[in-house]
Amino acid sequence: MRAWYDLAAAGDPQAQHNIGYLYEEGLGVTQQYDVAMDWYRRAADGGLAEAEHNLGMMYVEGRGAAKSWAQGLIYFRKAADKGLTESRYMIALSYFEGEGQIQNRRLAYEGFRDTAIEGYADSQYMLSFMLLDGTDVKRRSAQAYVWAALALIQGQQQAQEIRDAAAMRIDEKKTSDALFVLSQCESSGVRGCLLSLDSLP
């Protein structure tokens, strides 16, 4: 940790982020959210996307500062502009929930889909939820089944409920088609099976 402090003092954003993480989690130091935020902010000022995201999460969760989705979104957008998937998911979630900005389920769907294609499990779960529920999008239960199954494979346990509910809504033929597409996705990745996945009802 001494080496990280030396690098952090010299302005290294990754070292500053690492120290922030130690204080956030209480790893080898006393857990102090305000100190963690200070280090994350320094790293974020240095342009480190992971620090911008973690700072945004602390605002959203109200750790070290008053809970504020609006403030968190400032940092999520900075990290998202650098391509960070986790931050792009959080922006989509804010559109879905109407937290920190006006609710927009269409933009939420687009954000979840984009990051789900990249393999982000939480996005796959939320996309499956929207497709099963018909939440401002056309209900597609077979697609919901596959997306939920993909999320579950990655350990997103909430997706099991969606997968099982979707299975109850599709007949034997659609189930067979969904399982075939799922096997394609597992072997070739989501981008490799996307055309087949999009063709499912």
Q: What spans do the regions from the language model cover?
A:
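TPR/TPR-like alpha-solenoid signature
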Residues: 17, 38, 53, 74, ...
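Alpha-helical, heptad-rich or low-complexity scaffold/stalk segments
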Residues: 5-6, 21, 27, 33-34, ...
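TPR/TPR-like alpha-solenoid repeats
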Residues: 22, 43, 58, 79, ...
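Structural signature of tandem alpha-helical TPR/SEL1-like repeats
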Residues: 1-2, 30-42, 66-75, 102-111, ...
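Short helix-capping/linker turns of helical repeat alpha-solenoids
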Residues: 9-12, 25-27, 32, 45-49, ...
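Hydrophobic face of amphipathic alpha-helices that form TPR/SEL1-like repeat modules
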Residues: 18-25, 54-61, 88-97, 111, ...
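Terminal, low-structured helical/coil segments at or just beyond the last alpha-helical repeat
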Residues: 156-201
